[in-house]
A protein has these predicted regions:
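Nucleotidyltransferase catalytic core that binds NTPs
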Residues: 21-160
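Short, Lys/Arg-enriched N-terminal segments with co-localized hydrophobic residues
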Residues: 5-19
Length: 160
């Protein structure tokens, strides 16, 4: 049984006849966003590494409230894993993630491959104060990877 919030979102989706889209390339993502912005729509972004949970769901709902268009990135970012951290063991369930995003009214999931996000292995964003504090003390490349991917996502989606 749906709660009232889920019913409201479902009704909203039906009224707008939304079909959530999935893109895997930077080019197709930029093209969609450009078209939405030409129509005068506001675009919000919820960056994730997938394997979504209620915390992500609350961010998607908030983004839905504040924007005409909701883009969710679902990208396991290899640059924020150190050599002793197991990137391959990071949980992934794209089918589950996409079903959740669609149920929450997301308009687009951007699901790129690492080669599309990191075609230039020499360009990074690094904030030294982050790398030296918090978990940066024990995971020295973590924040460089996070800052880089978030910068790239902001550049690709250009959220309002």
């Amino acid at each position: 049984m749906l709660n009232s919030e889920q019913e409201a979102i479902s009704e909203f989706i039906i009224k707008r006849r939304i079909i959530m889209q999935v893109t895997t390339t930077v080019e197709e993502t930029r093209k969609l966003v450009k078209n939405w912005k030409k129509e005068g729509k506001t675009v919000g972004l919820v960056p994730t590494m997938g394997f979504l949970h209620e915390g992500h769901a609350s961010l998607i709902r908030r983004c839905r409230e504040e924007n005409d268009i909701v883009v969710v990135s679902d990208f396991v970012n290899p640059t924020q894993f150190g050599p002793t951290e197991d990137l391959e063991a990071y949980p992934r369930d794209f089918k589950r993630d996409s079903e959740l995003c669609e149920s929450l009214g997301a308009d687009l999931i951007f699901h790129p491959e690492p080669k599309d996000m990191y075609h230039d292995p020499h360009a990074y964003v690094s904030i030294d104060t982050l790398s030296d504090t918090l978990c940066g003390k024990t995971r020295p490349i973590h924040f460089k990877g996070v800052c880089t991917v978030v910068s790239k996502l902001f550049n690709i989606v250009a959220p309002d």
